[in-house]
Design a protein with these regions (language model features):
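Short, low-complexity intrinsically disordered segments enriched in A/P/G/S/L with frequent Arg
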Residues: 532-538
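Glycine-biased, low-complexity coil/linker segments
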Residues: 538-545, 549
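A glycine- and charged-residue-rich anion-binding loop/surface
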Residues: 1-531, 550-552
């Protein structure tokens, strides 16, 4: 028998190499590398996984197809120096065909053949497959390292793997009639990977040597959502009962029937996936924020909210969509029930925050995209001649309006344009360094940015500021004059301030370097040229009374 092991958190404790738990093997990694042992040699689990960053990032595919998710459950069985290929393959076949009743003639198995010629072909696994009752020997297919060789890292434990695929029928060929590869590991959706059996038998050294491990292990992984779609006979993971409750809520909110929903399914898939992901993230303590895991939580919530506007949902709705997620998964994952209040509250608050700035942020983005499309020239700042928006400009939109890169990219791609991701990440890293090692995107990130964006929008409506906001020129003149347009104290807009108050001021123009810009000795002063009843100063310089010092 196997020991049932609970899922670990989406936050992988003790593993600084991972942002999120992205596979079932993460909690057993120390066993494979030999730094830990377990009181069992056989295990089975259903692991919560997130794939939204790094090598394993499915975000771009979510919504565009029926099989990818940011959050999913990975089913797996494990052998730590116990059974090996013969039992693992036989039990896989038995479960799929005898227990679940999948048609034997529709199943294929892939095995490893080294395209580099350095590792022996896995004839052992191939021959075991051919011995399974009712298995078609012609359905054993060989592939190279990309498809059928697994490595935990650049060096260390590794080995061949054997994937099980199912032929869903000619009608599932989503590229039917076009010139494409229709087959296992091909380009269409007719053939679906169900299960992967990884056989960890080698240790890879930095000089390229492969040596047999003293103990051989088995690591299997099967996407829960995929196998449910096959067993329920539907053509989309999102049409299984796993998402029924969520889609029922969306249908009620929009007044759209299932048939109408399926005609333009992308927004519904994105919302269903992202709300489920956000609920599980918050349940594991990852709340919306500006850096790392918290940025991911914020991004997927805002992306879901933005897709909500595409189907007519302009008031906060995500908490309502999350209710069935908590209800349906809560019995197996009690952390969802325990964190119910936090989940619903964070979803609603994040939606409200984003609603304050999305209009301004998307308007500024659209202005840049219009220029990009109309000119396709590098003569304009922030655009190039390849239809790609400069990543630093995209970062400015996030820093000012809280518009995540992923949403900017969505909007650009809807117009056959794109955004430079490398440039965005570089700008983000530069800003983190400038603001002292990544302090939540600096003073002008996140909620602070959104608050000031709201003031900016109001001043623009009143014609007190132009389209581009505060005029910024720290180079031309050491002296800049302007009237006080707005005052901020303790994070609130105020009409007046008294002597001794620490306040911030919004000016029509400034000669100060932006926060975290310039050098240590780049300082200056704000002075009142004439007496006025409520002296204050602020953004660009914080201080007390009528005179204060501003710095970079």
């Amino acid at each position: 028998g196997h020991t049932a092991v609970p899922s670990m958190s989406l936050v992988p404790g003790g593993d600084a190499t991972l942002l999120f738990t992205n596979s079932g093997m993460v909690q057993f990694k120390d066993v494979f590398v030999g730094t830990d042992t377990r009181p069992y040699t056989r295990a089975v689990d259903s692991q919560k996984c997130m794939r939204v960053a790094g090598k394993h990032n499915d975000l771009e595919d979510v919504g565009r197809d029926d099989t990818h998710h940011t959050f999913f459950e990975m089913l797996g069985n494990w052998s730590f120096g116990d059974y090996y290929k013969k039992d693992a393959i036989a039990w896989s076949w038995q479960l799929l065909t005898e227990v679940w009743g999948l048609p034997k003639d529709k199943l294929y198995a892939t095995c490893f053949r080294d395209d580099k010629g350095n590792v022996p072909q896995d004839d052992e696994a191939a021959n075991i497959w051919k011995e399974q009752p009712g298995f078609d020997p012609e359905h054993v297919l060989f592939f190279g390292r990309k498809e059928n060789f697994w490595q935990m890292a650049e060096f260390g434990p590794c080995g061949p793997c054997s994937e099980i695929h199912i032929d869903l029928g000619e009608e599932r060929d989503n590229l039917r009639g076009r010139d494409h590869v229709c087959g296992v590991n091909g380009e269409c959706t007719r053939f679906l990977e169900l299960w992967n059996n990884v056989f960890i038998q080698y240790n890879l050294f930095d000089d390229g040597r492969l040596e047999p491990l003293p103990s051989k292990h088995v690591d299997t992984g099967m996407g829960f959502e995929r196998i449910v779609s096959v067993l329920q006979g539907v053509d989309s993971n999102y049409k299984t009962d796993l998402f029924k409750g969520v889609l029922d809520v969306l249908a009620s909110l929009t007044g759209v029937s299932r048939e109408e929903m399926y005609k333009d399914f992308t927004p519904y898939r994105v919302i269903a996936d992202h709300v489920r992901s956000a609920a599980f993230l918050i349940g594991d303590g990852v709340v919306p924020g500006n850096a790392g895991r918290n940025y991911v939580a914020r991004m997927i919530i805002r992306r879901a909210a933005r897709f909500g506007t595409k189907i007519g949902l302009h008031e906060p709705f995500l908490a309502k969509v999350a209710e069935p997620v908590i209800e349906e998964y809560g019995s197996f994952y009690p952390e969802l029930v325990k964190s119910r209040g936090a989940i619903l509250d964070n979803l609603t608050r994040e939606e409200i925050r984003f609603a304050r700035t999305i209009e301004s942020g998307t308007a500024q983005l659209q202005n840049l995209l219009d220029r990009l499309r109309d000119t396709k020239t590098s003569a304009l700042d922030g655009v190039d001649n390849m239809g790609v928006l400069d990543g630093h400009r995209a970062f400015d939109l996030y820093a000012t309006y809280g518009l995540p890169f992923e949403i900017a990219r969505d909007i650009a791609r809807e117009q056959n344009l794109d955004v430079d991701e490398a440039g965005f990440r570089a700008a983000m890293d530069e800003h983190r360094l400038a603001s002292g090692g990544g302090k939540a995107m600096g003073k002008l990130g996140g909620e602070d940015a959104e608050f000031f964006a709201g003031i900016l929008k109001d001043l623009q409506k009143k014609k007190k500021l132009g389209e581009h906001g505060v005029e910024y020129d720290p180079y031309t003149s050491p002296r800049v004059e302007g009237e006080v347009l707005a005052l901020v104290m303790n994070g609130q807009s105020v009409q007046s301030a008294s002597f001794g108050d620490q306040v911030e001021v919004i000016l029509p123009k400034t000669g100060f370097y932006i926060e975290s810009g310039g050098q240590v000795d780049d300082t200056g002063y704000i002075r009142a040229l004439t007496p006025f009843p409520s002296p204050s100063l602020g953004r660009g310089g914080r201080g007390q009374g009528v005179e204060g010092e501003g710095g970079s």
